[in-house]
Amino acid sequence: MSDWQRLDPRMLVVEPVSELRRFLPVLLGALLAGGFARGGGLGWELLAVAVPVAIGVARYLTTRYRILDGRVELRRGLLQRTLRTAQLDRVRTVDVTASLVHRVLGLATVRIGTGAGAEQDLELDGLRAPQAQELREALLARVAHEAHAPDDADAAAPPAAPTERPVLRLDPGWARYAPFTSAGVVAAAALLGVASQALPDSAWRLDRLPDLAPAGWGWLLLVAVGVLAAAVSSAVLAVLGYLVAHWDLTLTRSPTQWRLTRGLLTTRETSVEDARLAGVVVREPLGLRLAGAAELGAVVTGLGQGEKGTLTLVPPAPRAVVDGVAGAVLGDDRPTDAPLTAPLRTHGPAAVRRRRLRALAPAVVLVALVTASVGADLLTPWSLVLALLVLPAAIALGEDRARSLGHLASEGFLVSRSGSLARHREVLGAEHVIGWTVRDTWFQRRSGLVTLEATTAGGSQRVQVLDVPEHDGLVLAAALTPDLLAEVGYRTPPSQ
């Protein structure tokens, strides 16, 4: 591909349509303010359509790409020509996507991620689908060759793409977990809030409930049916959204890379080098935990700050499935689930007290406000009931947060778990830790606790170990990265 290549001619259909979509507000304005309202001609309307169509055609005619001397080049533009270059040894990801229109025309888009930010990625929009796959394989093969080839100019040609083996294929039945995700719960709560607006004001006063009978109870029953219908609708929408986003999800692995394919209306294929996977994140929001499910994300290093450093490998699925895939990601040539199943080291009574206090304090403040409103004649029976329910809920939340808190150094991995409503377990390879940060607030210092942060180049850029005793945190850091701490003159403290 040393010569400049043009995109597929079928993009002459896609590009003008895309430009028309971008110019839609202008087109509507021209239609409303044009000759139709004055009984004139169609000149302005035709011009408003012709301009974006011409821009789309010009975009296609002036776009070229090539692969030459270890780099990918993309050239486009007529009046203002731009040339974008990506070195093959800096390619981090190769994504192949195809919208519904692209799939109808047999086209695909190749997006080459370089780690310099989403705006610096190279996007080849309009390749034939087989050509896009060939380019993806060629790029990944050349990337591996550039990374491992000797320095001399007579290096061997890039090896053929290795055989891939399947790791996971989506079971459509897993869509039953979609309503239990955070998005599903929020949607249900929103629909419940909207439905509650239909209640008359008297329904919120316990002393007026007898006045609603008997006709009022029929109204309440109607509202209850509406709330139930809204809940069912939100569950159905969550299931449909799950299937559209993750349809035919397939995760495969070769000796050097992982490949993830998913999507119904828009298919997306993401390829990531194995060396870029720094760890995993097992997300266990409360709803999924109660349903015996979880979600798995992979921590990917080398992505730009504007990109998402956590790639979803497994959408909400049975916990056993999530643990199996996570073990395959962490275990390299042999699956391992020790960082996922081993008991975690607790953080002691001081950390437990902080978890309980942080959960209970807002509830106590709310109850205090409700109590103070008694004298001001602002208290309603429903607000009193709410205040009484908040206290036990806060106590349960604090206990669950305390049980969830823990850490572990297992088989060269840093393991940290925290949270309750959105609990997650983060597993990070020690070789991907590039630094440590110790933070403590005034309240933490009084309890002898710190927040230990492992800095990394992937995901959220850090893995936090919350409210860990200072001695335990330093021992954990020294156990995972002894050389890193030795560089700053730190030695493992004696046991206490």
Which role does the model predict for each range below?
Residues 1-496:
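N-terminal basic, Ser/Thr-rich segments that initiate or prime the first beta/alpha elements at protein or domain
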